[in-house]
């Protein structure tokens, strides 16, 4: 609870920055916004709220709800370069995952990534690179590594005629934290594909692959989604929904089935 209280000023600061950026900006077309949301290094402020529900986890058929708060804030460095700051802060509520009758709720560890990316694409190609950080914000012993981590992150994408495809990858190693906890040596890989239409509707699919090099395990999930961009009042939003299909992973970590819903508050320039 103490860590959650400390994070509230950060959340309010992000909200204030977004509100200031929103003022005086012109509306963009629905497809243009959808294409930018498909691009992890687009020059676009957004606040995605990603909800995941996973069922049938482990020996006790546990269930987990994860809300990923994922603010994206671009910073203009020069006429040729931007820095795209991306945060993933998970809030988790799970039952019967760590043991029958067990219940855990709270923050999990945050991942903070900074992508240095060219301001303009070349023939539809864009790329980005930068550091990724693991921050032990977890408020429950079962939801945190209690480790600080750092490593490289990179992505490559191609966009043309409403199509977006590419991949994002990062590797994290722990360098400090609780000595009684296992070290972190983990890679995350996310290939993705999206097709957006003039109406702002779209279809997409990505795979989320997490490899733990110390435990020699790989957890992979396929996420097909249907998306839409619309406006409610003066606020531009994007919505997405789809199943989460487990592909591989150890029995104690892999779910049998899941669902994903995403609500993104968009602040076009």
Located regions from the model:
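Cleavable N-terminal export/targeting peptides
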Residues: 1-30, 269
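Transmembrane beta-barrel domains of Gram-negative outer membranes and organellar outer membranes
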Residues: 21-269
């Amino acid at each position: 609870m103490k860590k959650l209280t400390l994070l509230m000023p950060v959340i309010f600061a992000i909200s204030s920055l977004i509100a200031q950026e929103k003022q005086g900006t012109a509306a963009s077309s629905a497809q243009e916004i959808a294409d930018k949301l498909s691009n992890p290094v687009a020059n676009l402020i957004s606040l995605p709220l990603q909800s995941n529900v996973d069922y049938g986890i482990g020996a006790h058929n546990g269930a987990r709800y994860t809300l990923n708060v994922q603010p994206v804030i671009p910073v203009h460095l020069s006429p040729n370069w931007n820095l795209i700051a991306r945060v993933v802060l998970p809030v988790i509520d799970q039952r019967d995952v760590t043991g029958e009758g067990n219940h855990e709720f709270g923050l999990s560890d945050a991942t903070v990534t900074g992508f240095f990316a060219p301001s303009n694409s070349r023939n539809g190609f864009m790329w980005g690179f930068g550091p990724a950080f693991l921050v032990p914000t977890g408020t429950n012993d079962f939801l945190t590594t209690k480790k600080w981590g750092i490593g490289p992150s990179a992505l490559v994408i191609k966009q043309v005629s409403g199509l977006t495809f590419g991949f994002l990858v990062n590797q994290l190693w722990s360098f400090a934290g609780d000595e009684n906890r296992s070290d972190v040596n983990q890679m995350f890989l996310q290939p993705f594909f999206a097709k957006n239409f003039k109406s702002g509707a779209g279809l997409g699919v990505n795979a989320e692959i997490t490899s733990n090099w110390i435990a020699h395990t790989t957890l992979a999930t396929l996420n097909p989604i249907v998306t839409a961009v619309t406006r409610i009042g003066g606020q531009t939003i994007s919505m997405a929904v789809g199943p989460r299909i487990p592909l591989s992973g150890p029995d104690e970590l892999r779910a049998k089935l899941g669902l994903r819903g995403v609500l993104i508050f968009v602040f076009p320039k």
